[in-house]
Amino acid sequence: MKKRHVWAMCSVMAAFAAHGGEVLFEHGKEFKIGNRQCKEFRFVSPDPAKGRVVVDLRCRIDYPRAAGWCPCWQIEVNGKAITAAATRSETRLLNRPYYLNNKWHGRYPADNRSDKWYALYLPDFKSAERHFNPPSISEATRVALDISDLVKTDSTNTVTLRAGGVSGSFYKSQGVTDRTPGVVFGEIRIYTEKELSRIPRATEKIVRATVKNSVKTVFSVDRKSDAFNVSVSGEGTPVKSVFSVPGGGEIGLGGKDRIETPFYTVSRKVAVRSNRIDIYDTFVSKTNELIGVKIRYEIPQKGFDPVYVAGDSSPSAEEFPGGRNPSVFGVNAKGGYSMALLAQDDVFRVQNVQYCKEGFFGIRTDGLALKPGEPRTVEWSIYPVASDDYYDFVNAVRRDWDVNFPIIGSFNLSMNMFRKFSEKSAKGIVRNFGLSVNSFGCHIWSHLGGKYKEYKDVIFGMGMNSPQVRVKIDAKKSVLEDPRVVHQFKRECIANARKYTPDLKILSYIHNQISVGIDDDKYEDCRMINAKGKPMNYNGGATQKLFVPTKDNLYGRDFKKLADWYLDNFDLDGLYHDELNHCNSRIYYGDKMWDGSTVELDGNNNVKRKLSYVCLLKLDFTLDLFGHVMNKRGKLFIGNFSPETRSERKFRFPRFEETYSSRWIALSHLYTPIQLGDMLTYANTPKDMAADQRMALKRGALYYHYCGGTGCPTLSSKMFPFTPVELHGGWLVGKERILTAVSGEFGWRGESPEVDVFVFDELGREVKGYPWSRKDTANGRIFTLELKPDHCAAIVKR
């Protein structure tokens, strides 16, 4: 172990010597950070204009053997989480390429294209060497980052390391009991080099709230035979439409209304609205065989920076699949305008990939199926915006999609705690979170205590009302258990909640793809199939099978009955549905079902095989389940994952986004903008939980607590109900209240309400008597609030 330390120290010090650097900070020993914990380092920096500043460290997941990798740590410089890419053209990662070649598992990435970094499961740093080709101990566990653009010269700098997402259940299932989940960091050093940084200096943009009028954009469309241009303020932007051709090659539509290939025709209809251009491209196959087409709608990236990919402006965000936020938004700062592309119809949304790469940003599908003679219309829109504000685009889409409806809350997943809660504890969590709705989370056996405390499994799907269920005890052993003991546990929790907190709405957890029933074999034709043609289990486990429910298959019909069973057998106000869109994989690779819309194409653009998106396969089932629970049974629904289809919008209920990756928060922007509390790296301390709530506001979202508790009412206690009017990066305007993590002027256009102002400090505590002012204007009453650092506030109508 000492030799490894000496080797690592010498190798890094050799780098200092080679580059003539100065050591600003060093911590020579290994240290471990557990899940939801952090460690902070401070240093003083010279002027980075004279030489770049580098933070250099090693990391690995503390595990007794090599076992793959996961995104599980975060690094912040002066409070800003950083990624491998500094800009669209400059990397921050100095010591290695973005991907390394792992001999067993393929490409090992640096980060998750957001602010979570990968680490390897390893017993020590040296053991990584044999798993990479070529051997790369110095690279696979090492991260050297250029932070020159973020350091300050007039005050102390901080580097914060956070860990989280190392699965404790994985440790238990593999019989690892000699250590706790966490990330081990090796020698961390911060130093300068003579070489100058290529990263442009960051300029801190001070966000200040204003009472904004809706942006009115004057634009025009110029359609020539070879081009489709959209002009804002006289400056034209070309929007390209490119389609693949079976046999190889591609064809562009330009500004024409119709093109024809030997295999299909495309006819275009354009509708110019007041704030957007709606485009309808109808494809008709001319062949007697199934064919497919790749479709790209894109804008040259030159002159546009930043570019938001599915709402994420990070330079690491190159592409993102799916229909939750099927948009790209590019800012042309020089021209004073922005351009956005948006997928609209169900199929194009689900198949959609948003991207910014290779000189273009756009939206695409890689395999739209065309049956013989079948017309298929792809609907998409262009949004010209006369500002550089992404949220002006978001608010325009939200109005067009009619998704500004009342959102209930606050919501939590802590019903399983109510069996042991005292009356004081039950009322405390309701008061502190502002809870109006609470749900059971996964039905975890260990929650029951007693002999079940060491069980490593969960009851999913049909297992809940099955005579027996499969339960995994450890890595090798499973037993059969009677689920009625879980039923009794749920009833005891519900009884206490009804007694202590009678106004609290109670939901039960459901998941429509995972099941552990003893007789699940009868659903074998409904199994989820992976890319190798094999049936899938949840997270690759042994007992939890994955299925695809449809309105017509046996599993789908029985799952609808299961929803009724929950509502009939427990005193519930509704259901919480986890992972509404898909689980583990978006794509079903089997041949027993087909979504009728998706194919995989080979290198010559010929059909290789049929594929299916799970969301499309089960769409009719999903809509039927929503209607049954909400309309026929009159119950509440809350869901995980924003809608991927237009069809789902007719059912209005809260759907949040998890935060395994912080970029997922932006996926909520076009429906109910809700972040489920950080699931990986933020600790359960008052300071971190308050910071997490402020971060949600800065990313344009409301907040549902996930883990932990608060010792006092925080901002979330004043957050709901909330009917969105406008979203902004730092403050949200609702009909009932305004929530803010920034200073500025606030109000409701044309209204002069009386309000109460609640301010919360860096620990989430209310600050009584915090100063604010108001003034009446011709456009309504304006409230001015100057917040101290790390404070937030709710301005609530009386």
Where are these regions (language model features)?
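Asparagine-centered strand-capping/turn motif at beta-strand->loop junctions
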Residues: S45, F283-N288, W748-E751
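An acidic-aromatic substrate-binding cleft motif
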Residues: E379-K472, T501-P502
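Beta-strand-rich recognition domains
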Residues: G21-I206
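Polysaccharide-binding surfaces and accessory modules of carbohydrate-active proteins
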Residues: S197-S241, G249-P262, V266-V353
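Active-site neighborhood of glycoside hydrolase catalytic domains
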Residues: L554-R646
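Active-site-proximal substrate-binding groove within the catalytic cores of carbohydrate-active enzymes
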Residues: G373-E374, V378, Y613-R798
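Beta-strand-rich recognition/accessory modules
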Residues: F243-G248, I259-E260, R273, D278, ...
